């Protein structure tokens, strides 16, 4: 069972965390009244603050509410969602962005109804550049058309620029801080970095989840060369190195339509959707006709939990 795997790995009560995340979901839904929030990025000021478990709990709460939800692991330096869920897809984010795998092959069902996973490969060089690519932005747009919610798990904004880069592309950002652990100045710096990236900050999520001492900083080493990590459940995972020739692979060098065909989505789904009109008192929003179209081969009906 996926739930047992989560509890064993994270040493947490998932059900309790999901219940608490329902409040976060309610706040996100409230924030969506005027400006829709479908893509949510979860980051933290530093390591071991409960970022990834919070992202999973929020995604699970969304799925339990009957929403087709995708959790997207974009922490290419220390991925964890596949391990937490006990799901190991054949391909990940980078395979899709490079056009080597169709989106259908990369998106995997989980044991939680309505919840899907798009994992990431380990040891990808220059993760921030990958997240800043035109293809990543287009992929997010395609996913937001196929799912009710997309939850993006990124590295801590206080340690790497990855989160700030991706924060500008999503509908909203939640910053995880750990009670009695996160420093006030670190939180202020993280918020300033997100604001500088023009991110829409939904709020702070305070956690106090007990976690074992980890080697997160070592795992996030400068050269990104570490290939083995001892997990908290005693299992040793061997990570594959990314071949040098793949590291320089450009993600914007060819025609976007050709790439769309390779990953199995329509070019129209990669285009930026028109902004929905803002609701004002006494006035109803008029749906945009183009937003109603379901033209992608990666349509909502493609994956049914």
Where is each model-derived feature located?
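P-loop NTP-binding module
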Residues: 1-305
């Amino acid at each position: 069972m996926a739930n047992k795997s989560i509890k064993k790995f994270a040493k947490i009560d998932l059900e309790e965390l999901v219940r608490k995340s329902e409040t976060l979901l309610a706040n996100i839904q409230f924030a969506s009244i005027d400006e829709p929030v479908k893509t949510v990025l979860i980051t933290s000021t530093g390591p071991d603050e409960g970022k990834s478990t919070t992202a999973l709990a929020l995604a699970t709460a969304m799925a339990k509410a009957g929403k087709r939800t995708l959790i997207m692991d974009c922490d290419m330096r220390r991925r964890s969602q596949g391990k937490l869920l006990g799901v190991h897809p054949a391909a990940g984010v980078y395979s899709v962005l490079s056009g080597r795998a169709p989106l259908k092959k990369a998106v995997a069902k989980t044991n939680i109804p309505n919840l899907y996973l798009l994992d990431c490969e380990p040891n990808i060089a220059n993760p921030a550049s990958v997240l800043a690519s035109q293809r990543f932005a287009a992929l997010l747009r395609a996913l937001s058309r196929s799912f009710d919610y997309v939850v993006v798990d990124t590295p801590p904004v206080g340690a790497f620029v990855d989160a700030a880069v991706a924060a500008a592309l999503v509908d909203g950002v939640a910053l995880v801080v750990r009670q009695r652990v996160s420093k006030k100045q670190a939180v202020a710096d993280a918020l300033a970095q997100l604001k500088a990236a023009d991110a829409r900050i939904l709020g702070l999520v305070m956690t106090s989840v007990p976690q074992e001492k980890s080697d997160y900083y070592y795992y996030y080493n400068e050269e990104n060369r570490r290939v083995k990590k001892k997990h908290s459940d005693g299992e040793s995972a061997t990570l594959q190195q990314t071949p040098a020739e793949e590291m320089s692979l450009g993600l914007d060098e060819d025609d976007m339509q050709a790439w769309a065909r390779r990953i199995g989505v329509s070019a129209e789904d990669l285009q930026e959707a028109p902004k929905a009109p803002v609701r004002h008192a006494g006035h109803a929003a008029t749906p945009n006709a183009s937003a109603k179209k379901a033209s992608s081969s990666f349509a909502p009906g493609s994956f049914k939990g």
